Amino acid sequence: MQDTTLHIRHLGKQDYESVWHAMQHYTDTRDSESHDELWIVEHPPVFTQGQAGKSEHILNAGDIPVIQVDRGGQVTYHGPGQLVVYPLLDIKRSKVGVRQLVTHIEQSIVDMLAKYDINAYAKADAPGVYVDERKIASLGLRIRKGCSFHGLALNVDMDLAPFRRINPCGYAGLEMAQCKALGGPQTVIEAGEQLTITFSQLLGYQHLVHHQGLAAS
């Protein structure tokens, strides 16, 4: 039976590795009674290389660290002004398939941007969300013990130049877009608030409980 309560954790600005390890710990130690959670965070500049990643897609990392991680997908960039959302969900309990979860995540971004009259869309052959063939949101998940972690990154109001140091998600020359320039959410906080609404509605959560920071381990 699905847990109809979703716990939202507002983490503020946090370094990537500490949040990644906290996600792993939560997933490894959760049981059938554990809450479904949505972690909302903003990271300092970092490139993360997924399990399918190839080193040749990192063109010139320069002074930005590269971290090899355990999510699906290839290389992407996180930095200030980007909304990062990690859904820590028991999809086995809620009977949601992995492909269905990916579709729900993409659609929640599309629905949120539609409120701002931005015509965004997903692609069957390239996970993420796009506007006029430019990528505005990236997606990479990991499923362990029937539970999801890692998640999505939505460009809101950021310096997009570091994306030119990589082939984003393995695609050479892929152009990026961001919300503020398109008349969408102007801040990471606004984007997080709006995306939480569309995501929880699509996944069938009826109650939202908000927390500041991570739970004490």
From Swiss-Prot:
Q: Name the enzyme's class.
A: transferase
Alphabetized GO MF terms: lipoyl(octanoyl) transferase activity
Q: Which Gene3D superfamilies match?
A: Bira Bifunctional Protein, Domain 2
Q: What is its main location?
A: cytoplasm
Pathway the protein takes part in: Protein modification; protein lipoylation via endogenous pathway; protein N(6)-(lipoyl)lysine from octanoyl-[acyl-carrier-protein]: step 1/2
CDD domains (UniProt xref): LipB
Q: What is its EC number?
A: 2.3.1.181
Q: Which PROSITE patterns match?
A: BPL_LPL_CATALYTIC, LIPB
Q: Does the keyword RNA-binding apply?
A: no
Reaction(s) catalysed (UniProt annotation): octanoyl-[ACP] + L-lysyl-[protein] = N(6)-octanoyl-L-lysyl-[protein] + holo-[ACP] + H(+)
- Family matches, as Pfam families: LplA-B_cat
The subcellular location is: Cytoplasm
Q: Where does substrate bind?
A: R71, G72, G73, Q74, V75, T76, Y77, H78, S138, L139, G140, G151, L152, A153
**Cellular component terms per the entry's GO annotation:** cytoplasm
**Active site annotation, chain numbering:** C169
Q: Name one GO biological process term.
A: protein modification process
Give TM segment ranges: none
- The BPL/LPL catalytic domain covers 32-207
Q: Give site residues, Lowers pKa of active site Cys.
A: K135
Q: Keyword set for this entry?
A: Acyltransferase, Cytoplasm, Transferase
Q: Fetch the HAMAP family from UniProt.
A: LipB
Additional comments on file? Answer: In the reaction, the free carboxyl group of octanoic acid is attached via an amide linkage to the epsilon-amino group of a specific lysine residue of lipoyl domains of lipoate-dependent enzymes.
The UniProt family comment states: Belongs to the LipB family.
Purpose: Catalyzes the transfer of endogenously produced octanoic acid from octanoyl-acyl-carrier-protein onto the lipoyl domains of lipoate-dependent enzymes. Lipoyl-ACP can also act as a substrate although octanoyl-ACP is likely to be the physiological substrate.
Name under which the protein is recorded: Octanoyltransferase
Q: Which organism is it from?
A: Shewanella baltica (strain OS223)
User: What's the gene?
Assistant: lipB
